[in-house]
Amino acid sequence: MKDNQNVNRRDAIKLGFGATVLGASGLSHAHDQGVKTPFPVEQVFIPIAGSDQEFPVRRIYCIGRNYAAHAIEMGSDPTREPPFFFQKPTDAIQFVAPNKIVDHPYPSLTKNYHYEVELVAALNKGGKNIPVDKALDLVYGYALGLDMTRRDLQRFMGDQKKPWEIGKSFDHSAPIGPIFPVAKTGHFIKGNIQLSVNGVVKQKADLSQMIWSVAEQISKLSEANELFPGDIIYSGTPENVGPVVRGDVIRCQINGLPDLSIKIV
């Protein structure tokens, strides 16, 4: 496959054949069934820290406005609005190795490109209507991530009462570090989360300030969608989101996880 220059065009994407699929209802492992397909399909994996194994990504869920101050700066009332979720395409993943500054391309169609640092939960179990007190049993591990956003497109579509997927779902819009198993880190209930641009702190909060905890997010999300192994959940960003331009270096931090750094190019 080395002669195919289009293969592995993004970090964390590997070549797979046929449909994948983690045992999801109605789906099968194509290679196990001997199914032949007319072309290869890229599959997305995230390295697991301290292991030669990789985490297969099924879906990327994101929660919106999950810190009170961020909800207010985005024009919402955090005291009364229920949680809402959106998705990014699986191949929006851009893996960012620890202790490196990875180039991140400034996307097309935008003049107002924003950062949002987030804790990411990775699931190895699934279910529907999961009670809050059982929800963390589904979590395999955690990672540090960024929900990169074309804010001008998001706002333009929102003002027109149209879906704002174009502002959130695009190539490389989900940078993420390695996944650390819960067995090594425990669950991230509290701890510092922050982001700096060119050494200046822009976002800083505590994970305990989430409006909806990771367990509550899993429970609420499972009411609307059956969850499966391989699903990951971006758990929301603190206040003070803002723009970056080419040449800026973003550094993300969560206590207990290695830093994540990208350079906008």
Give residue ranges: language-model regions.
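Short, structured patches in soluble enzyme cores that scaffold and shape functional sites
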Residues: V117-L119, L123-K125, A143-M148, F180, ...
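N-terminal secretory signal peptides and thylakoid transit peptides that target proteins
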Residues: K2-T20
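Extended, compositionally biased flexible segments
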Residues: Q33-K134
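Hydrophobic, well-structured mid-protein blocks that either form specific transmembrane helices
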Residues: N129-P163
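Boundary at the C-terminal end of the N-terminal hydrophobic targeting segment
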Residues: S28-A30
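Catalytic-pocket segment enriched in acidic/His residues
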Residues: D32-E54, A97-P98, R151-V265
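A generic structural signal for short beta-strands and their flanking turns/coil linkers
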Residues: R80-P82, P89, Y115-L119, L138-L144, ...
